[in-house]
Amino acid sequence: MDFAYSDKVKALQARLAAFMDEHIYPNEQRFYREIATGDRWQPTAVMEELKEKAKAAGLWNLFLPESERGAGLTNLEYAPLCEIMGRAPMAPEAFNCSAPDTGNMEVLERYGSEEHKKQWLAPLLDGKIRSCFSMTEPAVASSDATNIESRIERDGDHYVINGRKWWSSGAGDPRCKIIIFMGKSDPKNADRYRQQSMILVPIDAKGVNILRTLPVFGYDDAPHGHAEIEFENVRVPATNMLLGEGRGFEIA
């Protein structure tokens, strides 16, 4: 395989590095100062300013391969750009290339309905809302996702969701509006990798309770955060199921 950078990638690297020098690095102290002196769990003014500048510079949504909504880059072409963005912890969000939104947006692009894309993907791509991903659970070793115990049960035209998740990345952000939830819809399936499904859950749905945000080595990652969330008899439309029951691992 040829790992040499294409002319397109080299040009983007140069533009991205210049943007980092001009706008990101000089604003790092301001970013952390705004977090420290204001409400830690509210978006900072400087980040919103940087996002608009990145859009104007054509350095927005650089991820999302094989989609007209992205920048037309393969993962191989996107990787060296991530290396540059990764030089400042605040940078990926400024380019709308931060986790878990990038992965969640790709899931919506690949497997969401047109209504999902209109309601959730479009504002995510525009940087107006954020998202979170809920898989890990406190009661089981979730590094092996076949262990998860949360339930997704069909009830007519709805699914009912119950369980407790933690380390739900992005849930602390007040702009977070949608959760991609992974749970078991068919726990008795002989194929352990067909027991799980992924489903969309609005964060303001009745029964979704954010219990606390969790620090990582003492760092709370405000205003993004990693939360412990309780799902108690949460009802969502059956149309919120992604790809189909039992296809959670296929999506992952």
Regions found by a protein language model. Give the residues of each.
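Amphipathic, small/basic residue-rich leader segments at the start of a protein or domain
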Residues: 1-99, 110, 115-126, 130
